[in-house]
From Swiss-Prot:
Oligomer and partners: Homodimer.
Family, per entry: Belongs to the methylthioribose kinase family.
GO terms (BP aspect): L-methionine salvage from methylthioadenosine
Residues where ATP binds: 40, 57, 111-113, 246-248
Taxonomic lineage: Bacteria, Pseudomonadati, Pseudomonadota, Gammaproteobacteria, Enterobacterales
Top-level class of the enzyme under EC nomenclature: transferase
Organism: Pectobacterium carotovorum subsp. carotovorum (strain PC1)
Example of a GO MF term: S-methyl-5-thioribose kinase activity
Name listed for the protein in its UniProt record: Methylthioribose kinase
Chemical reaction(s) catalysed: 5-(methylsulfanyl)-D-ribose + ATP = 5-(methylsulfanyl)-alpha-D-ribose 1-phosphate + ADP + H(+)
Binding site for substrate: 229, 344
Domain of life: Bacteria
Record's function text: Catalyzes the phosphorylation of methylthioribose into methylthioribose-1-phosphate.
Pathway: Amino-acid biosynthesis; L-methionine biosynthesis via salvage pathway; S-methyl-5-thio-alpha-D-ribose 1-phosphate from S-methyl-5'-thioadenosine (hydrolase route): step 2/2
């Protein structure tokens, strides 16, 4: 019989007292439910002075924004905890610390990051964290290299692919990225004024063939242990610091998916800034986003190459020049997945504040159309966008 039960605030406090690693656990007295996501309960556990000390996160057996009609496996809580623990082995400075996890209760205790801010919220406000892009590139390089065939022993990797098999969460990604936006589906959400733009996507045979190729890669390329949902809403930032959270979509997949999703969220902000800020501030913010993209890719690729030079364990993959060739394919994949992120975040189920928080209707629609158009361009042109400079040139040419 399952021991699972949905936590109340009191349950969360008691659990944190037992497993939060706090020196005086009896000082933990209150829980504040802060979860604004779709899949989990999240509690801040506070002491007698009102200071939040640890986080208790519990997976729900259904998609929260839909309800019990969309059930979900609780095993995703184990996968999230084990993904974060694995990533923390290789990049502890940029991975949230897991203090304890219990697969049966689908619950995890994490370090409190109240002194950090969600990166997306900061980007929407126009706040700049100039170190964040390089730190995200470092996180991606360390976690993806060390769980790839370059570094991981083949026997260990094959076992890990099984350990992190995540079919239900992958199904969500497969549907939301590669299927729903290109068909009529009840999960899709967009303003009626965008109907002609959406229909044009659905009628675009070349686009749908390119998306099919990206989906096929997502299904078949077990290249490394991905975060699986690495957008600006799953990243905490503070001055000089960055931490990745929310890894329940973790699985072994194409490295370009994580890289492309990260770049895509910077481009979503780029598309939204003219509707969020005054013209001069928006223009300056856009230049910072493009520089963030350049920094992210250059940091990721340089670190991945350095790691491959020094830590590759497979003698064939360690051949001089091979890692650079491999990264060319990662780059092409990343540009394509970036495009699908732009499209699905604009017309699919899970939208972003970078676009949806724009108050003026015509400005919001213009920014959304830009995201759709740019996403289409990147999916189609990915094989021909040779490097990050070419990508930034395409973005600048995209107008709006």
């Amino acid at each position: 019989m399952s021991l699972y039960r949905t936590f109340t605030a009191n349950d969360a406090v008691e659990y944190a007292r037992q497993f939060g690693g706090v020196s005086q656990p009896q000082t933990l007295v209150a829980a504040e439910e802060i979860g604004d996501g779709n899949l989990n309960l999240v509690f801040k556990i506070k002491d007698e002075t009102g200071v939040s000390r640890v986080i208790v996160k519990q997976a729900l057996p259904y998609v929260r924004c839909v309800g019990e009609s969309w059930p979900l496996t609780l095993d995703r809580a184990r996968i999230e905890a084990e993904t974060l623990l694995t990533h923390a082995r290789f990049c502890p400075q940029h991975t949230v610390t897991v203090l304890y996890h219990d697969p049966e209760l689908a619950v995890m205790v994490q370090e409190d990051l109240s002194d950090h801010r969600i990166w997306r919220s900061e980007l929407v406000k126009g706040a700049d964290y100039p170190q964040a892009a390089a730190q995200l590139g470092e996180y991606l390089a360390q976690t993806l290299f060390h769980t790839s065939d370059f570094h991981q022993h083949p026997h260990e990797k094959k076992a890990a692919v099984s350990q992190f098999t995540n079919p239900e969460l992958c199904q969500i990604t497969e549907d939301l990225f590669f299927t729903d936006p290109y068909i009529e589906h009840e999960r899709n959400q967009f303003d009626a004024a965008l109907t002609p733009d959406v229909q044009a996507l659905r009628d675009d045979k070349a686009l749908k063939l390119a998306v099919a190729g990206l989906k096929h890669g997502f299904l078949s390329k077990a290249e490394a242990l991905l975060h699986g949902d690495i957008h600006s809403g799953s990243i905490f930032v503070a001055e000089g610091r960055l931490k990745a959270i929310d890894a329940e979509f973790g699985f072994y997949g194409p490295i370009g998916f994580d890289v492309g999703t990260a770049i895509g969220n910077l481009l979503l902000n780029y598309c939204g800034l003219p509707g969020l800020l005054a013209p001069r501030e928006a223009a300056a913010g856009r230049e910072r986003r493009l520089e963030d993209i350049r920094t992210l890719w250059q940091t990721f690729s340089a670190r991945f190459l350095a790691l491959s030079d020094n830590e590759s364990r497979d003698p064939a993959l360690a051949e001089s020049g091979y890692a650079a060739l491999f990264l060319q394919q990662v780059w092409r994949d990343a540009v394509g997945y970036c495009g699908t992120e732009l499209i699905r975040r604009t017309i699919g189920l899970a939208h972003v504040a970078d676009l949806d928080s724009i108050q003026e209707t015509e400005a919001r629609l213009a920014c959304q159309r830009h995201a759709i158009s740019l996403g289409r361009t990147l999916v189609l042109a990915a094989p021909h966008i040779a490097d990050v400079d070419a990508l930034l040139a395409r973005v600048r040419q995209s107008g709006a």
